Amino acid sequence: MKLLYIDLFCGAGGTSTGVEKARLENEQCAKVIACVNHDKNAIASHAANHPDALHFTEDIRTLNLSPLVSHLQKCRAEYPEALIVLWASLECTNFSKAKGGQPRDADSRTLAEHLFRYIEAINPDYIQIENVEEFMSWGDLDEYGKPISRDKGKSYLRWLDNVRSYGYKFEHKILNSADYGAYTSRKRFFGIFAKGSLPIVFPEQTHSKKPDQKLKNWKAVRDVLDFDDEGKSIFGRKTPLVDSSLLRIYAGLIKFVAGGKDAFMVKYNSMSKAGKYNAPGVEDPCPVTVSYTHLRAHET
């Protein structure tokens, strides 16, 4: 085993599953040994998929690190050549532009600061961070919980310097999941801290919206949608759809069906600045979805 991962903010285990699918010369090269999440349902799901990992249903800010350190020592003894990776998919809601003009939770925006005690206790070889692009704009908030424009990015840069002070170098990239064969288009910040002379390597792009001889075309979400499941017709409803929902469907009919297509997506927050709805198609990757289900596939 080349890499041993500790997954903070592990959720139901998407990152952990990706880590353990990694292969080097057709052999598994990475293993998730421990994970932390405050949500018991997320941990239950993670444990079902990764039963060999040590699970902590705790807030990362208050977790007693002694059991984690003890477990890590045992894993290091079993895999003495393995490098230790601390992965943190920091809570992103209060950085994201999807938050709009709403106030931010100042406490949530400081979760990255709580990584320092993990760094000191674990001394990882690598630290890998995933978040929304706006993480780089992290700065102070005013009395109303709104970002102060003149302080944009100051907290982020200060945090970077603090992590570097532990002997790490740092690189980051903004990567789109669709560029790596996913059925969704989602841009995210990925940052890698590496100790000493350890290399920092990002994956090579495999797909593109405009492919060439080296890159494949983006994958169409149509390929993973079950159009045999017709759902419920919008006609004959006890309560008719509101006008905004009908306008979103109408926009898709005009954009796609009038042009000969038989299916399209309806997205809740799809209105442009000009006040027009822009329906996504099914021949492209799915646009970003959120925890509440405001994305639908429509077939004529």
Predicted regions and their residues:
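S-adenosyl-L-methionine-dependent DNA methyltransferase catalytic core
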Residues: 1-32, 162-169, 184-299
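Short, P/G- and charge-enriched loop/turn segments at secondary-structure junctions
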Residues: 74-78, 177-179, 274-277
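Conserved Class I SAM-dependent methyltransferase catalytic core
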Residues: 110-193
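Proline-centered helix-kink/hinge sites
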Residues: 90-91, 124, 132, 183, ...
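Core alpha/beta nucleotide-donor-binding catalytic domains of modification enzymes
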Residues: 2-122, 132-150
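Active-site donor-binding loop signature of nucleotide-sugar glycosyltransferases
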Residues: 58-60, 177, 291
